[in-house]
Amino acid sequence: MDSSSSSNYFSVGSTNPSAVVLLYSKELKKWDEFEDILEERRHVSDLKFAMKCYTPLVYKGITPCKPSDIKNSVLNSEEIHYVIKQLSMESLQSVDVLREEVCEILDEMSHKLRLGAIRFFAFALSKIFKQIFSKVCVNEEGIQKLQRAIQEHPVVLLPSHRSYIDFLMLSFLLYNYDLPVPVIAAGMDFLGMKMIGELLRMSGAFFMRRTFGGNKLYWAVFSEYVKTMLRNGYAPVEFFLEGTRSRSAKTLTPKFGLLSIVMEPFFKREVFDTYLVPISISYDKILEETLYAYELLGVPKPKESTTGLLKARRILSENFGSIYVYFGDPVSLRSLASGRMSRSPYNLVPRYIPQKQSEDMHAFVTEVAYKMQLLQIENLVLSPWPLIVAVLLQNRPSMDFDALLEKTLWLKGLTQAFGGFLIWPDNEPAEEVVQHHILLHSNIASLVKDQVILKLESGDSEVVDGLIFQHITLLTCSTYRNQLLNIFVRPSLVAVALQMTPGFRKEDVYSAFRFLRDVFSDEFIFFPGNTVKDFEEGCYLLCKSETIQMTTRDILVTEKGNAVLEFLIGLFRPFVECYKLLCIYLLKEEEEHFTEKQYLAAVRKFTSQLLNQGASQCYDVLSSDVQKNALAAFVRLGVVEKKKVNNDYIFSVNEPATTKLEEMLGCKIPIGKPATAKL
């Protein structure tokens, strides 16, 4: 049930008006223990590790085959024969020409998984990881559950995506634990890397185009290729729900294409079940942090190349702290579909005939994608640094070390109360922990004479590679702060809603919360139609931390709650400020129509001027990630209209709706009870 008809959720009675009234309760999750796999690697020869006896446990229903057999199976499948026949009639191309095209697509796409390549990467990655990471921590209980799952049913691995390292990390870990290495969906960009592209292909990568452009034959070949590997139980299939690396450390909204494909064999009764395994990969320090800041500031992403990889060797002399890889419980697709989706519609048509996805099926795929992402988020590890940097950003440019330590420890308690997966070495003095993480991130902050100072200048020059150094540092800091928002977003939205609501009537606060959740649903992961539960979770966490009390009618702020609310509002304020500034830009936009590229360039110029003039201190607005998310939200809210013209999308501003949104975000007009999606 969605939130729009939920007034009865807030009418739970109590004779005592000061009593806390909540329908939501949440037990604190207990996570598995971590083991550092590098500890053993440091005492055993890398060559011995790479050449070890490797006999992985496999799926009980496996059909043994070579990579070339999979290609032949796809080429000769009923589905591809049917699609070729249909396209031949539509395009008047001969069947032989189309069949030749299928062979070319398969040659471009398919992996050539070989044990020799796996052993090479095991040797190389073991050396590299020991050089740049203190630890690579894995929950071995999760590995044991995965081991059982792989033998029972086809498995799909769904890791979070923050770094290029993610790509081969799971292959390295599964090889380490004698599990079958996965076949991995990779972008075509990697094929441009001489030798490396082929090495990746031999380590299990299969390549997909970023866009299929309505190419029916390509889609048919790609989906049949993935389904063939899944049906045969050839190897676990791995792909990233986010589709690309998150440059901002916030989980990106999911892509649904590959998830739809891997679900199909179950719905067509070709497999009894399929396990989906959410995997959370967390970094103390992200290898590409500076590169990401450049990209967010508008510098084009460097093309993947072998030369670029060789230039990146300098990172081998740096310390990136620890990596944490948490394997979540395998989730049965059969259980998810039980009572929710019927498989009978698939019985009405022969399996080889492609079917258009029904609305019900699309809704189900969407729900599963968001569920998997929320499970990933739940198991993402927070190191002390995101807490430290969140405090620093609210007290920039510098802070007394003792004050920073005190505030960070206060935030540590709040993070744990909110159920955050915080790894904090309690056996070490707190000041040493904070000092260690400042040193680890010495490119961003430094400790000078009891003052912790953000590095906002670069020697004699304020400009580096055409970018203002201060902007690079602050966007890098924002990336780490964003890790906190994964668990703080719901209580933060309640805090901002309280600030926006004159009087603290529960239903008015809820209306403001619903409005904010709707506006920012491209920035954060919310389960579709779960607004009430999200509101209750936010309120529950604020009650649990003794920030608020709830009566049947009102939300009351406690005496100690003001400090928590002030911090949460400060944590979320950059996003509200960004969207307000982008509304102001749109109202000044002189062009009647514009493309996304024109919008990004003009917004960058407009916001840079505001910051240079001191008219705003909101550096997050420089992020192309925020700018793109805001544009998507504005289209969804009817603030901007989007049309397709000559294979490109053009946008135009709805001025009254934009003005209204800007005023609502700035609390100039009340939200009102019917906070509908369209403004």
Curated annotation (Swiss-Prot):
Pathway: Membrane lipid metabolism; glycerophospholipid metabolism. One of its GO terms (biological process) is phospholipid biosynthetic process. The modification N6-acetyllysine is found at K642. The modification Phosphoserine is found at S11. A motif (HXXXXD motif) lies at residues 161-166. GO terms for molecular function: glycerol-3-phosphate O-acyltransferase activity; glycerone-phosphate O-acyltransferase activity. It is found in: Peroxisome membrane. One of its GO terms (cellular component) is mitochondrial membrane. Coiled coil: none annotated. It is a peripheral membrane protein. It comes from the Eukaryota. Pfam families: Acyltransferase, GPAT_C. Keywords: Acetylation, Acyltransferase, Membrane, Peroxisome, Phosphoprotein, Transferase. Dihydroxyacetonephosphate acyltransferase catalyzing the first step in the biosynthesis of plasmalogens, a subset of phospholipids that differ from other glycerolipids by having an alkyl chain attached through a vinyl ether linkage at the sn-1 position of the glycerol backbone, and which unique physical properties have an impact on various aspects of cell signaling and membrane biology. Belongs to the GPAT/DAPAT family. Part of a heterotrimeric complex composed of GNPAT, AGPS and a modified form of GNPAT. This is Dihydroxyacetone phosphate acyltransferase.
